[in-house]
Amino acid sequence: MLESLTLQPIALVNGTVNLPGSKSVSNRALLLAALAEGTTQLNNVLDSDDIRHMLNALQALGVDFRLSADRTCCEVDGLGGKLVAEQPLSLFLGNAGTAMRPLAAVLCLGNSDIVLTGEPRMKERPIGHLVDALRQGGAQIDYLEQENYPPLRLRGGFRGGELTVDGRVSSQFLTALLMTAPLAEQDTTIRIMGDLVSKPYIDITLHLMKAFGIDVGHENYQIFHIKGGQTYRSPGTYLVEGDASSASYFLAAAAIKGGTVRVTGIGKKSVQGDTKFADVLEKMGAKVTWGDDYIECSRGELQGIDMDMNHIPDAAMTIATTALFATGPTTIRNIYNWRVKETDRLTAMATELRKVGAEVEEGEDYIRVVPPLQLTAADIGTYDDHRMAMCFSLVALSDTPVTILDPKCTAKTFPDYFEQFARLSQLA
């Protein structure tokens, strides 16, 4: 039996949430700190499953680090160059794409013999486009089970050079190549085929590389130029900003049933594209205020929206459940990459929205949601996907309870999400 959590109807949400650190920023920063010259003090690191998988891998690769008792501060002694394994090594990375993709690239520098594997779902998440690009740069990589999917066996050999990578499936493939290229022997030019999805996530990568002393030139996100033979240098300390995708649930809750909710740790200077989620809520009718270190949202009369959300794929899921409380239909477009995330999020979202009474049209790369007059109480399947669990908590902002199956799946990015959500909520 799966555990479940029933949320009773909520009359009002109000208060402040200090956001946990960003998953995307935490795992990039940990890896760059490990590769850098010098010791880096990382503050506000996320403590979650995906981060633990990265830390376990770095430890197995001989990286020394010290974690604070609450695991949110990490002091990393950089190796000042590539990560190597003296003996053949197997690394288990769970379902952490932010660990699997960058490590698959970085560990192709040098000539170690390393296997990367993970949970069954990780073996269904495509990695072929990244492997193709790494092979163009000389990497020796074997698929151990299914072609184009993990587990992978890496035997080094990556030297840089002229690479092309498909940009349409995941921006993490490009992130992995960008973080690896400065340490390669040769200069690297990366050309993007097709439209690059989730561009703002590339901005996070470039921002972090710059913080660790490396500048990357690019031509409109289509061609990237990286000098080889460089070394990352520790910035000394680095503050991980709050997780903007995690902020989306609290901001949406305020838009639906505020009161006013303030999330801290992100703001108008944030490097994460998912902060643009607040602009979408504003377009729908919520009231939004931005500070340097906070975003605040208050209730408004919400209207349905029709919008391309390729730039905020994770936070866009929150719009799909917010749509239940808007007047008129909502269409979220250009989100094909929902299909290759923790689960096939398009099908999962459509299935569960129908359970609570919505009329849903699921396209190849879009979803259209027509809200019901009255929401239906339902048991929500979460598909081992943290974001499904968090998105559907918003159903309780109606006069109907909702039951979330396997609520602990939020441990991937936000272990105490439901406690934080309850803290803001006044029950009907």
Swiss-Prot record:
Keywords: Amino-acid biosynthesis, Aromatic amino acid biosynthesis, Cytoplasm, Transferase. Phosphoenolpyruvate binds at K23, G97, R125, Q172, R345, R387, K412. One of its GO terms (cellular component) is cytoplasm. Its EC number is 2.5.1.19. Pfam families: EPSP_synthase (PF00275). The keyword Cytoplasm applies. 3-phosphoshikimate binds at K23, S24, R28, S170, S171, Q172, S198, D314, N337, K341. The active site is at D314. Disulfide bonds: none annotated. PANTHER family: AROM/DEHYDROQUINATE SYNTHASE, PENTAFUNCTIONAL AROM POLYPEPTIDE. Monomer. This is 3-phosphoshikimate 1-carboxyvinyltransferase. The lineage of its organism: Bacteria, Pseudomonadati, Pseudomonadota, Gammaproteobacteria, Enterobacterales. The gene is aroA.
